[in-house]
C-alpha cells in the first residue's frame, strides 16, 4: 500500500491538473499566507502541556482529554472537515493504522470544526472505528494555536467548489485549523507533533506509531 505522503501527492497532482491556473493562484497564495504568518511555529509544540478540552463526539457524547489520558498516550489529529479530500485520505490512513496505534498503547481521536451531524456523516462514510470530535467554533484548535481565517478570495473559490463551510461548521467565521497531529504522553505533555501550513501535507501514520513506541 502506498504511503500517505504518496497518496496525498497523487491527489494534489491530479487536482492541479484539473483546477484552472487563476484558481490555483488564489489557493497557493492563501497557503503562502498561512506559512508566512508563523502560525505553525507558534502553535503548541513538543514539551508543552496539551490544553485540556471536553468535546462532543459524532453521537453527541462528551469526551474529555483528561479521561482519555487515563488509558495511556493519546493521538490527536486535527483536520479541516469531511469535505476535504486530503483529510479523507488522512482519516482512511489512520483507520488502516489503527490496530498498530492501539497496539502501541495509543488512543486515536480526530477533531474538526464540523457540526456533530457532519462529523457523524464522515465517520460513517469512511467507516472509522476511532472517535471523531466536533470542535464547533474552533475553540480547542484555538487553544492549540492552529486556527486561521480563510481569505475572501479563497472563500469564493470554495463556493465554486460547492464547499459550504457555514453549513458544515455552523458559523460564518470561515476559520479552519491547520491540519496537525499530536502524540501526547500519559501525563498530558506533547511528545511529538506534526503541523504544516500546506494542507496537502499530513503526518505519516508510521511516524505516529514510532512516536508512540518511543514513549
Predicted regions and their residues:
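Thiol/selenol-based redox catalytic cores and closely related redox-interacting motifs
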Residues: 51, 135-201
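A generic structural motif
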Residues: 56-58, 184
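A short, polar/charged loop-to-alpha-helix boundary motif
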Residues: 197-215
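Structural microenvironment flanking redox-active thiols in thiol-disulfide oxidoreductases
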Residues: 90-143
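Short, positively charged
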Residues: 28-29, 33-34, 155-165, 213-214
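Short active-site neighborhood of thiol/selenol oxidoreductases, capturing the structured segment around
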Residues: 65-94
